[in-house]
């Protein structure tokens, strides 16, 4: 598919335990549609804005050959959609993983390198009620993820290199529970 194209709709086979969707619009909500309401679990994975722009600039230049000026024009042109359609989805998610660099990214338009996971923290935020709904034990997570800490009653911070491990610790039991509950209903 070309950038900006959607994959075609497909039927989900009977007996499917889990449908995993990855993309920009998993929690989109608007006039006449509410994709967020169809999901049992919404997980957001998003870098802080300047990091997102650095990644876009590097990717679009390396993979598509776009000039820095053309990429900045694209970012500016898409800003209303970003503000009105992308960002609000993260208010719908149960859990957000947000990567925040610990190196200077104050001007994303001149950054030479994309900060590595080890040059970042990941803020893991749980929407109000999500910890209780999914049985998330902050004490367990803090014990299991070295150097993690709570930054608020609803957020844990981990080293960027530990994001995959944190996702595994958090999401695996949730998915198992979802399948168990589905099996009880059938």
Predicted features, each with a name:
Residues 34-46:
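Inter-motif core of Ras-like GTPase G domains
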Residues 12-14, 18, 35, 49-186:
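C-terminal accessory "lid"/substrate-recognition subdomains
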Residues 21-24, 45-46, 99:
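Short His-Asn-centered micro-motif
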Residues 1-30:
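Phosphate-binding/switch loop-helix module in NTP-utilizing enzymes
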């Amino acid at each position: 598919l070309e950038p900006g194209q959607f994959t075609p709709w497909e039927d989900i086979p009977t007996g499917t335990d889990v449908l995993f969707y990855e993309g920009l619009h998993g929690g989109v909500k608007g006039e006449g549609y509410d994709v967020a309401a169809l999901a049992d679990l919404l997980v957001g994975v998003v870098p802080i804005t300047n990091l997102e722009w650095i990644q876009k600039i590097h990717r679009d230049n390396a993979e598509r050959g776009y000039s820095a000026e053309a990429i900045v024009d694209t970012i500016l042109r898409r800003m209303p959609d970003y503000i009105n359609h992308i960002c609000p989805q993260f208010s719908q998610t149960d859990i957000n993983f947000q990567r925040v660099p610990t190196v200077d990214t104050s001007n994303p338009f001149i950054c030479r390198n994309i900060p590595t996971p080890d040059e970042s923290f990941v803020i893991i935020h749980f929407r109000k009620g999500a910890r209780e709904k999914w049985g998330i034990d902050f004490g367990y997570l803090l014990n299991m993820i070295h150097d993690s800490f709570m930054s608020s009653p609803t957020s844990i911070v981990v080293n960027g290199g530990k994001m995959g491990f944190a996702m595994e610790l958090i999401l695996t039991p949730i998915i198992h529970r979802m399948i168990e509950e589905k099996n009880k209903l059938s």
